[in-house]
From Swiss-Prot:
Oligomeric and partner information: Dimer of alpha and beta chains. A typical microtubule is a hollow water-filled tube with an outer diameter of 25 nm and an inner diameter of 15 nM. Alpha-beta heterodimers associate head-to-tail to form protofilaments running lengthwise along the microtubule wall with the beta-tubulin subunit facing the microtubule plus end conferring a structural polarity. Microtubules usually have 13 protofilaments but different protofilament numbers can be found in some organisms and specialized cells.
Gene giving rise to this polypeptide: alphaTub85E
Organism for this UniProt entry: Drosophila melanogaster (Fruit fly)
Protein name: Tubulin alpha-2 chain
Main location class: cytoplasm
Enzyme class: hydrolase
Keyword GTP-binding attached: yes
GO molecular function per UniProt: GTP binding; hydrolase activity; metal ion binding; structural constituent of cytoskeleton
Family membership: Belongs to the tubulin family.
Binding, Mg(2+): E71
SMART domains the record matches: Tubulin, Tubulin_C
Length: 449
């Protein structure tokens, strides 16, 4: 089996974890106590979900997941919530004092006290796997635990599980909706530290999700619950091919092979369609062509940036539901001719397709309508460098005055780390710039070969 272990870190990671596991359970017909009614198993015979759930002797299904936070309140909600019986108590790990939005606390002082407990628990989960495929790490960039502890754990996972792939789902600080003043510091420090340890990182920008909820679902004031359920749908689409048998399945390593042209350029942009409210769904027939087209609208992206200003390096379309290859090929052909999609000239073909016959599931009483088919597009585009540029600019404004730096230094960090991290991100922006340059312009340099 190709098992995946999910690691949910900090408040954002844990709350997205709640939304994801709620959805996985609905998709696989697993009850909140972990049991699967026998009538489901007779007809289905689909055991692909064991990539995400392990089964105990008593027939209970337990998520292959760890929830970690440096303070207990958020994880306590899992301990007392609807799904409290789903998880083994040891899978929910909490510290006593939080990281206080401080990367240095998450990474050095508070984080290092708990990291061995977490690794020990992950080791137990890994031992239950016959063929561990890799890790999915959920966290935010802005929080202290999400940034500091994640980067610490990723370093340790690289040491313990060198060849296993590590995918991140990172919550990028929203330009307008900020929860902490020091988010730019934390984001840049964590990106610098995790860059070499992560194989692929899907960024999700809270503000982009807010806008989608407002615009497509008519929710005036979206709560984190609304945001997380939408993010859950996207994560579910990305992982569906690992959990169901389909016509064109996509493996974890396959994502990297197709989406990551260079090790550092590993931040694909995710787009999901259709996001549609129950009222609207009655009146719309969402064809494959329509939802495919919607993926190229910047309004449906998970990160605020404009792909029309960048170039695509690779594009991965994951369909689920009532979709046949013929429709997909037609839709993609139309897009190639009509849309002004620019691919980098060294990567001419660029579309990878996955199809899963399991239609998208929605949480009962949620905001999203139940639809027959949906698509999640993962594209690696140079436009995502805009997101880094925004963060870097904010970092520079604060760092020029050395504002708030003493909090980090007081927790055992050296000021040099800030400069080092900032240089690394400047290099990352430069990498994106160079990747987008046409290769024909470099002919002058090739003469000596």
């Amino acid at each position: 089996m190709r098992e995946c272990i999910s690691v949910h870190i900090g408040q954002a990671g844990v709350q997205i974890g709640n939304a994801c596991w709620e959805l996985y359970c609905l998709e696989h017909g697993i009850q909140p106590d972990g049991h699967m009614p026998s009538d489901k198993t007779v007809g289905g015979g689909d055991d692909s979900f064991s990539t995400f759930f392990s089964e105990t002797g008593a027939g209970k299904h337990v998520p292959r997941a760890v929830f970690v936070d440096l303070e207990p309140t958020v994880v306590d909600e899992v301990r007392t919530g609807t799904y409290r019986q789903l998880f083994h108590p040891e899978q929910l790990i909490t510290g006593k004092e939080d990281a206080a939005n401080n990367y240095a606390r998450g990474h050095y002082t508070i984080g290092k006290e708990i990291v061995d407990v977490v690794l020990d628990r992950i080791r137990k989960l890994a031992d239950q796997c016959t063929g561990l495929q890799g890790f999915l790490v959920f966290h935010s960039f802005g929080g202290g635990t999400g940034s500091g502890f994640t980067s610490l754990l990723m370093e340790r996972l690289s040491v313990d599980y060198g060849k296993k792939s590590k995918l991140e789902f990172s919550i990028y600080p929203a330009p307008q909706v900020s929860t902490a003043v020091v988010e730019p510091y934390n984001s840049i420090l964590t990106t610098h530290t995790t860059l070499e340890h992560s194989d692929c990182a899907f960024m999700v920008d809270n503000e982009a999700i807010y806008d989608i909820c407002r615009r497509n679902l008519d929710i005036e004031r979206p709560t984190y619950m609304n945001l997380n359920r939408l993010i859950g749908q996207i994560v579910s689409s990305i992982t569906a091919s690992l959990r169901f048998d389909g016509a064109l399945n996509v493996d974890l390593t396959e994502f990297q092979t197709n989406l990551v042209p260079y090790p550092r350029i590993h931040f694909p942009l995710a787009t999901y369609a259709p996001v549609i409210s129950v009222e609207k769904a009655y009146h719309e027939q969402l064809t494959v062509a329509e939802i495919t087209n919607a993926c190229f609208e910047p309004a449906n992206q998970m990160v605020k940036c404009d792909p029309r200003r960048g170039k695509y390096m690779a594009c991965c379309m994951l369909y689920r539901g009532d979709v046949v290859p013929k429709d997909v090929n037609a839709a993609i052909a139309t897009i190639k001719t009509k849309r002004s999609i620019q691919f980098v000239d060294w990567c001419p073909t660029g579309f990878k397709v996955g199809i899963n016959y399991q239609p998208p599931t929605v949480v009962p009483g949620g905001d999203l309508a139940k639809v027959q088919r949906a698509v999640c597009m993962l594209s690696n585009t140079t436009a995502i460098a805009e997101a880094w540029a925004r963060l870097d600019h904010k970092f520079d404004l604060m760092y020029a005055k050395r504002a708030f730096v003493h909090w980090y230094v007081g927790e055992g960090m050296e000021e040099g780390e800030f400069a080092e991290a900032r240089e690394d991100l400047a290099a990352l922006e430069k990498d994106y710039e160079e990747v987008g340059i046409d290769s024909t312009t470099e002919l002058g340099e090739d003469e000596e070969y």
